[in-house]
């Protein structure tokens, strides 16, 4: 048995599509948008502001990694002050994540203009961090109403960020391949995403200004995010969310952990692993992911990302006590060993 629930998100994909922002907003009847982004201002934000024109109600540029709860409260205060009719999130997962946290509390539609491959724009998944605990969940109300994918906006994304963000997307697709009770559609979309990203990301690493390669990578990220929305999250995402509470960088944590989690789950999901390996163009899924990390220059471990040996026990206990679908039982002891191997 499987159950599919899909959000009502309009997607506009293609080079130069940011120029359609005003038209798309008018079509949806949105006239006062609060721009949600990070403190960093660049050419992308300037282009978004130009596209908004007199539809700009205000700017909330306080988004930060893992969506800290204090930033959410500040953003809610800004919403109450400005009273927009929509949230326009421009940037990566931090900006879109903050918009989702706002939308949980205030019934506002989200327009997303992603500039990375993180994928939050296509899901109903939200996350908020308080102290060293990151809480996540699903809520249809936070799924963006409109997503504009313009590959031109990714041309200036630094090489390391592109690689790590791309492997973040890869993790979405890989975990959807073996998720218990996921629909056949999820696996089909995920397999296409893996194949597309495996082809695109090395090209982006070599020629980061190649618009064709960037377009392919963004298409793969879009498909990976769709797969994530169609499938339950398992051990990999649970681990990444728990480690996010310790302040580890989100995308890099995905990249460092993914081969280890895939190797752990492999005995319990041989058919899915064979399909993953085939999509990667290798004979073994975990080895193929390690090789791709190497090609992309992502050779870091959890230790180099900031995880301390003293934190391993706390993280293992938190994951081991949680309930989530996974092909193989993830006890605290098993998770502890996995984290030690990934240090």
Locate each region found by the language model.
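A glycine/threonine-rich phosphate-anchoring loop and its flanking beta-alpha core
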Residues: 23, 104-188, 193, 272-275
């Amino acid at each position: 048995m499987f159950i599919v629930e899909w959000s009502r998100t309009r997607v506009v994909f293609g080079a130069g599509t940011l120029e359609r922002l005003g038209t798309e907003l008018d079509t949806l009847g949105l006239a006062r948008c609060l721009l949600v982004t990070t403190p960093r201002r660049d050419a992308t934000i300037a282009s978004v502001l130009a596209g908004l024109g007199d539809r700009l109600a205000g700017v909330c540029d306080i988004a930060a990694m893992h969506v800290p709860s204090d930033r959410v409260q500040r953003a809610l205060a800004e919403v109450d002050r400005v009273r927009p009719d929509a949230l326009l999130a421009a940037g990566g997962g931090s900006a879109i994540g903050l918009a989702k946290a706002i939308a949980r509390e205030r019934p506002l539609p989200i327009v997303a203009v992603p500039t990375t491959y993180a994928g939050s724009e296509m899901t109903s998944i939200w996350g908020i961090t308080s102290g060293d605990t990151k809480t996540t969940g699903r809520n249809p109300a936070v799924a963006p109403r409109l997503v504009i994918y313009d590959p031109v906006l990714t041309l200036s994304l630094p090489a390391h960020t592109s690689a790590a963000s791309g492997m973040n997307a890869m993790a979405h697709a890989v975990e959807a391949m073996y998720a218990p009770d996921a629909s056949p559609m999820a696996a089909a979309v995920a397999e296409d995403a893996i194949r597309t990203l495996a082809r695109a990301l090395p090209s982006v690493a070599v020629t980061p200004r190649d618009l064709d390669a960037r377009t392919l990578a963004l298409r793969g990220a879009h498909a990976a995010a769709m797969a994530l929305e169609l499938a339950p999250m398992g051990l990999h995402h649970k681990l990444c969310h728990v480690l996010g509470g310790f302040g580890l960088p989100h995308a890099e944590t995905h990249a460092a952990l993914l081969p280890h989690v895939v190797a752990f789950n492999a005995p319990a999901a041989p058919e899915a692993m064979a399909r993953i390996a085939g999509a990667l163009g290798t004979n073994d899924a975990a080895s193929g992911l390690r090789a791709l990390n190497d090609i992309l220059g992502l050779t870091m471990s959890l230790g180099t990302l900031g995880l301390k040996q003293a934190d391993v026990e706390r993280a293992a206990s938190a994951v081991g006590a949680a309930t989530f679908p996974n092909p193989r039982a993830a006890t605290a002891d098993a998770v502890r060993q996995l984290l030690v191997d990934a240090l």
